[in-house]
Amino acid sequence: MGLLSILRKLKSAPDQEVRILLLGLDNAGKTTLLKQLASEDISHITPTQGFNIKSVQSQGFKLNVWDIGGQRKIRPYWKNYFENTDILELAELLEEEKLSCVPVLIFANKQDLLTAAPASEIAEGLNLHTIRDRVWQIQSCSALTGEGVQDGMNWVCKNVNAKKK
Amino acid sequence: MFISLWEFFYGHFFRFWMKWLLRQMTGKCELQRIFDTYVGAQRTHRIENSLTYSKNKVLQKVTRVVQSEVDKYVDDIMKEKNINPEKDASFKICMKMCLLQITGYKQLYLDVESVRKRPYDSDNLQHEELLMKLWNLLMPTKKLNARISKQWAEIGFQGDDPKTDFRGMGILGLINLVYFSENYTSEAHQILSRSNHPKLGYSYAIVGINLTEMAYSLLKSEALKFHLYNFVPGIPTMEHFHQFYCYLVYEFDKFWFEEEPESIMYFNLYREKFHEKIKGLLLDCNVALTLKV
């Protein structure tokens, strides 16, 4: 292989960009999750008005993670962010047309609390077993300690790969 | 490269000889010359730098002492620098005030930090009373039906229990909200009613908590030094921190409605713009930001 073709090959495989929407109820821990992903300080977080966005590199992907405020008042704005979304992280939105076939990852957060419901219970509560039109996964995690967060992202990268091919 | 070389020579060589030369010419040490030339925050700031970068161990230490020891250290500095209290009577007074401001700023950060680290606790009667006080101040004519209630959204909390909204700011967020509502009641009512604007509206309480974060991080990064050195001739206290918070709340509301953002979804964009504006104002050594109504 000549130098030129190596260069050409490098050029033809730029980082794929993936758009991830983080949605959920207020005080679910979306911003903490986002900051944990970006390895930022999580001790000064305040409720999100509007949204936060961060880009993180993972396994050759550029993940653009959108963290949208969960407050009831701003949920009507969620749909403005649905265009071109690669991964989705909440079940309520499965019927939204713009999001059909988008893989869904549910983070069962706050597992560091003794009172947290286990992932299996949440899966049952959300009737995840009835989802047929897309791949889905439930991942227990603690955004506070970072446990399980990376596992979730690995699943994201794997499934985006499968979807795009 | 050239600049860092210059800084190296200046710090290690020229600064010493410059000071020596000036001392021979004026018969005064650097600290005295600063008192002669500067006032306000610029004076305190220069004294602080002169002490911090001093090669003298006694002088270096004084910016890190506690308030109760300030008197003793002023005497130490005067002994170390051979300053005759009869020839320069004002030195002792000026030095004391500067040291109170310098050490006071550091103490204020520690005090604010300890309040911030205290999470809101529903089992703490004081916390609960403070929360009810906030409701009564903002909604004097409306009764809260229950402690857990959808009504909290009317003053801009997210859910039916405000407890979860304080998060990283802890009880500091609530104390700030109550302080503003109590000391600027009519302004608070006006801002609350404006925040319910159908198009430009925002959530009053959580934006308030967000501005607590702004005030806190400005204090932490030492950006508030010029402001507090100008504003408080002595030890800055919690009260002064709350006052600055009130300034932010009042100014942010004005800024938001002047900018006319498309929707609340652009909050962080405008928040950052406002943050930059405030940081710019705080760079001026004559700054003193007060809420003028």
UniProtKB/Swiss-Prot annotation, chain A:
SUPFAM superfamilies: P-loop containing nucleoside triphosphate hydrolases
Membrane topology field: Peripheral membrane protein
PROSITE patterns according to UniProt: ARF (PS51417)
Matches recorded under InterPro entries: ARL2/3 (IPR044612), P-loop_NTPase (IPR027417), Small_GTP-bd (IPR005225), Small_GTPase_ARF/SAR (IPR006689)
GO terms classed as biological process: cilium assembly; Golgi to plasma membrane transport; kidney development; mitotic cytokinesis; photoreceptor cell development; protein localization to ciliary membrane; protein transport; small GTPase-mediated signal transduction
Localization (cell): Golgi apparatus membrane; Cytoplasm, Cytoskeleton, Spindle; Nucleus; Cytoplasm, Cytoskeleton, Microtubule organizing center, Centrosome
GO MF annotation list: GDP binding; GTP binding; GTPase activity; microtubule binding
Domain of life: Eukaryota
GO cellular component: centrosome; cilium; cytoplasmic microtubule; Golgi apparatus; Golgi membrane; midbody; nucleus; photoreceptor connecting cilium
Binding, GTP: 24-31, 67-71, 109-112
Lipidation (N-myristoyl glycine): 2
A Pfam cross-reference name: Arf
Keyword annotations of the record: Cell cycle, Cell division, Cell projection, Cytoplasm, Cytoskeleton, Golgi apparatus, GTP-binding, Lipoprotein, Membrane, Myristate, Nucleotide-binding, Nucleus, Phosphoprotein, Protein transport, Transport
Modified residues (Phosphoserine): 5
Oligomer status and interactors: Found in a complex with ARL3, RP2 and UNC119 (or UNC119B); RP2 induces hydrolysis of GTP ARL3 in the complex, leading to the release of UNC119 (or UNC119B). Interacts with RP2; interaction is direct and stimulated with the activated GTP-bound form of ARL3. Interacts with SYS1. Interacts with ARL2BP; the GTP-bound form interacts with ARL2BP. Microtubule-associated protein. Does not interact with TBCC. Interacts with RP2. Interacts with PDE6D; the interaction occurs specifically with the GTP-bound form of ARL3.
Job of this protein: Small GTP-binding protein which cycles between an inactive GDP-bound and an active GTP-bound form, and the rate of cycling is regulated by guanine nucleotide exchange factors (GEF) and GTPase-activating proteins (GAP). Required for normal cytokinesis and cilia signaling. Requires assistance from GTPase-activating proteins (GAPs) like RP2 and PDE6D, in order to cycle between inactive GDP-bound and active GTP-bound forms. Required for targeting proteins to the cilium, including myristoylated NPHP3 and prenylated INPP5E.
Family recorded in the similarity comment: Belongs to the small GTPase superfamily. Arf family.
Protein name: ADP-ribosylation factor-like protein 3
Organism expressing this protein natively: Pongo abelii (Sumatran orangutan)
